[in-house]
Structure formats: structure tokens, C-alpha cells
């Protein structure tokens, strides 16, 4: 709990004066004011977050957190939980979607085992920080203890602290965990007080009958556990996931260290939502990578006040959207740093 409390105490609002100064710098580039649209918003936010009007773009890292879910035993997913460790091994071999798109963006992928029901051999690119071998079935009991939830959050915070020490310029979130759309739907339903049906979709591609079953299972879990929306740790522990907790910690740690954090899709945003509920200033450090096909994602984004960069009908997770968005954010920073001013170009303003 000490690491979590320390991170929360360090999070400050982004400096409004820096945002204005970055915009003034952009307005002096050889273009009509505002003509690069959302690229300008990304550039000024990146500069203000880092506290540097000429931010250097060094290493970019996508942290893909992996964990299993007890709720899978209720038949809420198209795939068995054995796919979680199989996909982790695919990440480590460089063969997954996130690997391909991260390579394209010039980003590194680091896989974090925070709760997979499998014992991995130590491998390059794998960070083993296992809190438990998956969550428990939240349709029957609490997914985690409060202590487990905090421990998983602190895994993410520690990784953000290490990223700062390494000089990493931007971090992205990703995840792998069969069944993890169910806790994500439960989390937003708990905070928003909405019906489970409003925020639950097909995940990996389940049919109509399976979707109805999934909705009933999630509702049963919420009815049983009664998570307190005024207590984010209670929501996380009762109906969340270990990888979701790890993502929440990475987002909190990024905000505490003034590192821009690119949040992927539905499950990653569930983690970001926990972080924002723990500290309202966290949202100022988040770049929402994309608008997911999962219907609960829009409600999450509205709640944290985030505007998605991309809308490509993505629903894979892993950090794929984050990797893609990183390239656009980097492009926006290059505009801020490399585009000529009117004076430099000899152009009349």
C-alpha cells in the first residue's frame, strides 16, 4: 500500500501555462492556426505532460499485462483459459498483433505476468510479477482480496518508476487474459450504475445465446459482491482482474512520473478507469488510443473524459491500438519540434 499511496501523492495537474505555451509555439509554425487539428492537441499535451516544449522522443514501450480469470469457468468466453499462456508465448516469440504493430511504430513490447495460471521459464521480454494464478470466479465470490488488488496495482507502479529511470519517453498499455471483457464490463457497470446489458458485448466473438448468458453471469457477480462505486479498490478487488490492476498501476505510475501513457481498448481502459477513480488528475496524462467495438468502451471514455485518437473497429487488445496511436503521437511531437516557423521559412504570417 505504501507504493500506491506514494504514487497518488505525487500526481499533480498538468500545467495549463505549458499547454498555452506549446499551442503558441504551434501557432507560429508555417500553417494556419489549428490546421493540424488533433495532432496539435496531442503535441501540446505531450509537451505539457513532460514539462518540455521541445520534448525528446526516446524509447517507447508497450507493457502487455497477462492474467487469468476464474469467471471463465462460467462459459463467458469463446476460448479456454489455456489460450492465455499460449498467447504470452506468442508475444515472446514476436508473432502476435501487438508485436507486429509495435515494430512498425518503433516500440518495444514487454510482457508482464501478473496473474497467469501457468509457470513460465524466465525469458527475455517477460517480467514475472505473479500475484496469484488468476482471479477467483466473481460470480461465486470476490475476484481478489483487497491486498491482492493493491499488490497488482503496485506491480504497474513499479514498472512506471523503472520506465522513468530508464528514460522511456512514452508507455502504452496492453493485456492478455481469456475472459477479461467480463470483469471490464462489471467495472464500468459498477461505477456508472448502468445495466450490464448496456456495457457488455461479444468479446472474442460469442453468439447471441452466449452473450445473454454472459450478461446474466456478470449481473449475478455484481449482485453477489455489491462493489462500492465510491471505493475503486473495492470494485477492482470484487469484480476486476489482476492484469486490469497492473494496468491501473502503470497508468497511476506514469502520471506520478509525468510520462505520457497511451491506453489501448476496452480492458486497458477498465484499468485506466480504476486509476482515474483513485485520483482525478490521472486523466490529464492519458492518451486514449482508439474507440473499441466493445459497447462499454464509449461509456468508459466519457467517464474519464478521453477523446480516442483512432476509430478502426479494433477489438483485439494486447496493446495493438496503443502501438498504432504511438506513431501518431510521435508524429505530432515531430511537428512541434521540426516544423519551421514563419520567420525561419521566410513566410509572411
Curated annotation (Swiss-Prot):
The keyword NAD does not apply. Its EC number is 2.4.2.21. Keywords: Cobalamin biosynthesis, Glycosyltransferase, Transferase. It comes from the Bacteria. InterPro entries: Nict_dMeBzImd_PRibTrfase, Nict_dMeBzImd_PRibTrfase_bact, Nict_dMeBzImd_PRibTrfase_N, Nict_dMeBzImd_PRibTrfase_sf. GO terms for biological process: cobalamin biosynthetic process. One of its GO terms (molecular function) is nicotinate-nucleotide-dimethylbenzimidazole phosphoribosyltransferase activity. It catalyses: 5,6-dimethylbenzimidazole + nicotinate beta-D-ribonucleotide = alpha-ribazole 5'-phosphate + nicotinate + H(+). Pathway: Nucleoside biosynthesis; alpha-ribazole biosynthesis; alpha-ribazole from 5,6-dimethylbenzimidazole: step 1/2. The active site is at 318 (proton acceptor). The keyword Transferase applies. Catalyzes the synthesis of alpha-ribazole-5'-phosphate from nicotinate mononucleotide (NAMN) and 5,6-dimethylbenzimidazole (DMB). Belongs to the CobT family. This is Nicotinate-nucleotide--dimethylbenzimidazole phosphoribosyltransferase. The gene is cobT.
Amino acid at each position: 500500500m505504501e507504493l500506491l499511496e506514494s504514487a497518488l501523492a505525487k500526481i499533480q495537474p498538468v500545467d495549463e501555462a505549458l499547454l498555452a505555451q506549446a499551442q503558441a509555439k504551434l501557432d507560429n509554425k508555417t500553417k494556419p492556426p489549428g490546421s493540424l487539428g488533433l495532432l496539435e492537441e496531442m503535441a501540446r499535451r505531450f509537451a505539457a505532460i513532460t514539462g518540455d516544449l521541445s520534448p525528446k522522443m526516446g524509447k517507447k514501450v508497450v507493457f502487455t499485462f497477462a492474467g487469468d480469470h476464474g469467471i471463465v469457468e462460467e462459459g463467458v468466453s469463446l476460448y479456454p483459459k489455456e489460450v492465455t499462456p499460449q498467447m504470452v508465448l506468442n508475444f515472446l516469440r514476436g508473432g502476435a498483433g501487438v508485436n507486429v504493430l509495435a515494430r512498425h511504430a518503433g516500440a518495444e513490447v514487454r510482457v508482464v505476468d501478473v496473474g497467469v495460471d501457468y509457470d513460465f521459464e524466465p525469458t527475455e521480454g517477460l517480467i514475472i510479477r505473479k500475484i496469484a494464478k488468476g482471479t477467483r470466479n466473481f460470480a461465486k465470490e470476490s475476484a481478489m482480496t483487497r491486498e491482492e488488488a493493491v499488490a497488482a496495482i503496485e506491480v504497474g507502479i513499479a514498472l512506471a518508476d523503472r520506465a522513468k529511470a530508464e528514460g522511456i519517453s512514452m508507455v502504452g498499455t496492453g493485456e492478455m487474459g481469456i475472459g477479461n471483457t467480463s470483469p471490464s464490463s462489471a467495472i464500468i457497470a459498477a461505477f456508472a450504475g448502468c445495466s450490464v446489458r448496456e456495457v457488455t458485448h461479444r468479446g472474442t466473438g460469442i453468439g447471441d445465446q452466449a452473450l445473454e448468458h454472459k450478461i446474466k453471469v456478470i449481473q449475478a457477480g455484481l449482485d453477489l459482491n455489491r462493489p462500492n462505486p465510491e471505493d475503486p479498490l473495492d470494485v477492482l478487488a470484487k469484480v476486476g482482474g489482476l492484469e486490469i490492476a497492473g494496468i491501473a498501476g502503470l497508468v497511476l505510475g506514469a502520471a506520478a512520473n509525468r510520462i505520457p501513457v497511451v491506453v489501448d481498448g476496452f480492458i486497458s481502459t477498465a484499468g485506466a478507469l480504476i486509476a482515474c477513480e483513485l485520483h482525478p488528475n490521472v486523466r490529464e496524462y492519458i492518451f486514449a488510443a482508439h474507440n473499441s467495438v466493445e459497447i462499454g468502451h464509449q461509456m468508459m471514455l466519457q467517464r474519464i473524459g478521453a477523446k480516442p485518437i483512432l476509430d478502426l473497429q479494433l477489438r483485439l487488445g494486447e496493446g495493438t491500438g496503443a502501438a498504432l496511436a504511438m506513431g501518431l503521437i510521435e508524429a505530432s511531437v515531430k511537428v512541434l519540434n521540426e516544423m519551421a516557423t514563419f520567420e525561419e521559412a521566410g513566410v509572411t504570417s
